């Protein structure tokens, strides 16, 4: 996808472009935070397997409002959103700051992110535009039971049939209306930092 965009907008000879993908093995070195769901949890409202998790910021391509609308449609389930920027202020500007089932976690450590990914109900990534989109791959590597991504050319290229797809043209905020994928963990076999390094050296 990124290669085709470069060719389209910068008129570069496609034969001069080599695609080298991101990977996920760095998450193997991260130790999940053991205290996150313990007796003295930082976020006691979050229960294992009972919350949706997303990582966002105020960049429009991240489609933060979609997550809020999804939370609005499921008031009985918690939605945890990690990331920088004044997300709460943006929610207020959208008139969606009244949602009691949304938690703004701010910046999280790698250990916290891993723990949040492996214990969530599903990881949400409703992006409008990406060059790769590594967070869903990290979530799969961490053991997230479901990963929901937007049905865009980039996401289709990276995740194939191994993710649940959100059709943003018709789905304006629902985690229930998605096209299910299969065997998400199988996508991990496609990407490795070692393979990417070899390709760079070539």
Indicate where each model-derived feature is located.
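Carbohydrate transferase catalytic cores enriched for Leloir-type hexosyltransferases
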Residues: 1-202
């Amino acid at each position: 996808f990124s290669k085709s965009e470069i060719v389209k907008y910068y008129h570069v000879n496609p034969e001069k472009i080599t695609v080298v993908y991101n990977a996920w093995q760095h998450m193997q070195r991260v130790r999940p935070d053991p205290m996150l769901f313990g007796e003295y949890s930082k976020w006691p409202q979050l229960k294992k397997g009972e919350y949706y998790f997303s990582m966002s910021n105020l960049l429009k391509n991240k489609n933060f409002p979609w997550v809020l609308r999804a939370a609005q449609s499921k008031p009985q389930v918690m939605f945890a959103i990690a990331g920088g920027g004044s997300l709460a202020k943006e929610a207020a500007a959208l008139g969606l700051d009244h949602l009691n089932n949304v938690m703004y976690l701010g910046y999280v450590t790698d250990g916290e992110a891993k723990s949040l990914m492996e214990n969530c109900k599903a990881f949400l990534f409703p992006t409008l535009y990406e060059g790769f989109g590594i967070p869903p791959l990290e979530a799969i590597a961490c053991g997230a039971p479901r990963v929901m991504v937007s049905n865009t050319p980039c996401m289709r290229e990276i995740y194939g049939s191994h993710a649940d797809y959100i059709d943003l043209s018709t789905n304006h905020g629902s985690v229930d209306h998605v096209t299910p994928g299969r065997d998400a963990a199988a996508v991990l076999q496609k990407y490795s930092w070692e393979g990417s390094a070899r390709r760079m050296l070539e």
